[in-house]
Each structure stands twice: as structure tokens, then as C-alpha cells.
């Protein structure tokens, strides 16, 4: 909660009192996509937030509950357009759950001066414009805002997401899982990052709600395939963020796979362990101590017990990331594993986590969902 003596709090209170409430107002652009719908579900249980704008270019003036039947008699609102200028005048925070290029194409200093933005697209995740344009194959329309955008991986950049922050680049699903799984060992220099391989599996919701032949039931069911091999757009994000941790440029092999389930990501990562001065490999207890150093006090990262491998089912519908590792003494390599729900911690949940930091709320507010099982 806010500190009542905080000037920021007092300004917000005066602002909200003019509108007859003490809750902040949120607008969602892309509210009818899977990540946008998950934002709606989470924010409806957030005691500090009122959703004031269900933005959807495809469904303007249609009842939101007619699009998502699970919201029948829960959401009584019509979809609105994606007019960012009008929205910035009406709310305190905007979530843009939109395709790449949307926010960069409409963002102005005037908009940013009026409202905080949590962007779930990749427009401001990569600091190098040329790298963004190479991997996404579009021109970046607002490079002037890249430097100030904070990469909102909360467990790593929490101190940078503050009340003064205007723009948060919410990390992607594969990137969140891949980075958090390896981050402690990269940061502490315990693995040879030149040998790092990331093998990841995702459910079909990661491809979005749009109808595409490769994502039809008969195409996906009872099948599994690699895609974006050596070319997936999350590759440079993982390299950039782990490169910051390592203090040097990192190149990785990242291969995503599509599996026949609705939600979830499982990342299995491999790297050669660096030997200790005495020529031996780090022990299980030594590696476990490193993970505990970074994650023991983290609400949403769970380091599992020895011998327990993460499963997507154990995090489904929640904001948790489960991680663990196994040392292969025969090869001198370590196998790191991580699992999360791609729509929650991999998208909407992390976006709300960032919003909580932006407004000084309890970081876990609205996010204490118990994973669904079975």
C-alpha cells in the first residue's frame, strides 16, 4: 500500500477523489487476446484497481462477455477502440497486449506524460534498435523511448521499476522462463555461457487467439514440433539480459517447441560447469546455495527439492516459476529446468506485478492464485 505521507500518494489520492473513488483506473488495449483476457481475470481480483477500458480494435461496441463467455454476468462492459490519446486522459495505467509495432507506432511524449504504460509486446524490450529491426523485421517508430523503458523482469530489475518509471517493457514468456532458470549461475560465473543451450516447450496459447492453420486442433493434437529454429524472436532478448548478468556478450542456441496443451512453458537448459580451483565440479549443495541466494526470498520463484523436476501443471493459472537443476558429473554439465504459465508469469501476471511496483502496491497484490490441479 501507499505510505500516506508520500507526496506521490497524496497526488494520486487527490486525482482519484476527483473521480469519486480511491482506486486507480486501468485500461487494456488488446483485451480480447489471450494475454489481455488474462489481465482482465487478474485485475478483477485486484483490490486497488478498476478496469475502465476494455480495448479491442476487432470487437468495438461488442459486449466483452459475449466474446469471453466465462465473463458472463461478471463483466458488464463493451469493448472500446485503441485510441491511446483518449485513453491516457482517462486512466492511470495502460496495458498494451498488442502485436509488435503497435505501441511504438502511436507512443508520444504527451501520452507518456499523462499515464504509465506496461507494454506486453516486444517494442521496448531490446535496447539496440538495429537488433530489434533485424529480428522483428519492422522499423521501430519510437526509438527515442527505448532508453527509458525498463525491462520488467521483476526478480532481476525490481529496483528499476519505481513510481518514477513511465514505461515498462514486460518480458516475453520464453524469455522469462529461460532467463530466471539460468540467471543465478550466469551471474555468479559458474557456467561456461558459450555452451548454453535452451530447449523450451510451449502450449498453443502462446501463439495467440487468431485462427491459424498450424494451430488448429487436428494440426496440434498428438503432435509436437520445433519451430523458429535458430530464428525465434525471443533469442536476442535472452542473450541481451543474460549478457548483462555475465558482463559480456552471450550467444545461445534457443529452440522452442509447440506441444499439445493450452498453457505452460517448460525450459530445459544445458551448460558446461566451470571447475573449482581444485579441479572438481561444484557440488549440489554449492549450486543450491547460489539459487537460494537469489530466489529464497522471492515470492514467485520456487526452487524445488532435490530430484524434483518442474512440471507445467504445478504452475498452471499462477504467477509462479518453478526451477531446479541436476548436475551430470559424467559430462561435467548442468541441466537447469524451469516451468511457468505463459499467460500469467509469462505475460499478464508479470505485467500486474510490474504495475504493483509502479504504484507502490504490495508486489503480490492480485497475484496470490493457487496453481490449478489437475
Task: Go through each PLM region and give its residues.
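C-terminal substrate-binding/catalytic lobe of Rossmann-fold NAD(P)-dependent oxidoreductases
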Residues: 48-90, 194-200, 204-336
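Conserved active-site and cofactor/substrate-binding residues in soluble primary-metabolism enzymes
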Residues: 34, 148, 176-180, 229-237, ...
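NAD(P)-dependent Rossmann-like dehydrogenase/reductase catalytic/cofactor-binding core
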Residues: 320-374
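Short, well-ordered loop/turn and helix-capping segments at boundaries between secondary-structure elements
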Residues: 45, 244, 357-361
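N-terminal Rossmann-like NAD(P) cofactor-binding subdomain of oxidoreductases
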Residues: 2-222, 227-229, 326-329, 370-374
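Predominant activation on well-ordered alpha-helical scaffold segments within soluble catalytic domains
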Residues: 40, 179-186, 235-239, 288, ...
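Short strand->helix junction
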Residues: 175, 276-277, 341
Amino acid at each position: 500500500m501507499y505510505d500516506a505521507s508520500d507526496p506521490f500518494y497524496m497526488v494520486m489520492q487527490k486525482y482519484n477523489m476527483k473521480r469519486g473513488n480511491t482506486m486507480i483506473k486501468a485500461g487494456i488495449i488488446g483485451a480480447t487476446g489471450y494475454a489481455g483476457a488474462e489481465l482482465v481475470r487478474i485485475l478483477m481480483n485486484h483490490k486497488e484497481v478498476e478496469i475502465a477500458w476494455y480495448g479491442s480494435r476487432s470487437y468495438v461496441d461488442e459486449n466483452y462477455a459475449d466474446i469471453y463467455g466465462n465473463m458472463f454476468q461478471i463483466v458488464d462492459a463493451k469493448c472500446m477502440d485503441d485510441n491511446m490519446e483518449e485513453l491516457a486522459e482517462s486512466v492511470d495505467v495502460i496495458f498494451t497486449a498488442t502485436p509488435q509495432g503497435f505501441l511504438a507506432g502511436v507512443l508520444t511524449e504527451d501520452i507518456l506524460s499523462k499515464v504509465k504504460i506496461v507494454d506486453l509486446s516486444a517494442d521496448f524490450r531490446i535496447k539496440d534498435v538495429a537488433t530489434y529491426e533485424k529480428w522483428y523485421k519492422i522499423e521501430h517508430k519510437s526509438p527515442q523511448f527505448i532508453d527509458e523503458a525498463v525491462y520488467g523482469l521483476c526478480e532481476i530489475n525490481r529496483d528499476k521499476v519505481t513510481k518514477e518509471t513511465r514505461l515498462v517493457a514486460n518480458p516475453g514468456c520464453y524469455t522469462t522462463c529461460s532467463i530466471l532458470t539460468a540467471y543465478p549461475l550466469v551471474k555468479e560465473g559458474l557456467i561456461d555461457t558459450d555452451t548454453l543451450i535452451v530447449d523450451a516447450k510451449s502450449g498453443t496459447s502462446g501463439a495467440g487467439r487468431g485462427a491459424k492453420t498450424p494451430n488448429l486442433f487436428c494440426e496440434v493434437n498428438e503432435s509436437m514440433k520445433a519451430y523458429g529454429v535458430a530464428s525465434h524472436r525471443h533469442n536476442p532478448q535472452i542473450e541481451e539480459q543474460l549478457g548483462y548478468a555475465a558482463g559480456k556478450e552471450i550467444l545461445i542456441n534457443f529452440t522452442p517447441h509447440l506441444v499439445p496443451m493450452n498453457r505452460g512453458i517448460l525450459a530445459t537448459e544445458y551448460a558446461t560447469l566451470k571447475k573449482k580451483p581444485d579441479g572438481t565440479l561444484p557440488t549440489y549443495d554449492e549450486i543450491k546455495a547460489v539459487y537460494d541466494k537469489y530466489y529464497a526470498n522471492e515470492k514467485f520463484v520456487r526452487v524445488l527439492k532435490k530430484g524434483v523436476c518442474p512440471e507445467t501443471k504445478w504452475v498452471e493459472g499462477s504467477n509462479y516459476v518453478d526451477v531446479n537443476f541436476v548436475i551430470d558429473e559424467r559430462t561435467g554439465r548442468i541441466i537447469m529446468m524451469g516451468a511457468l504459465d505463459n499467460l500469467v508469469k509469462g505475460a499478464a501476471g508479470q505485467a500486474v506485478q510490474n504495475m504493483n511496483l509502479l504504484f507502490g502496491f504490495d508486489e503480490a497484490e492480485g497475484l496470490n492464485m493457487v496453481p490449478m490441479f489437475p
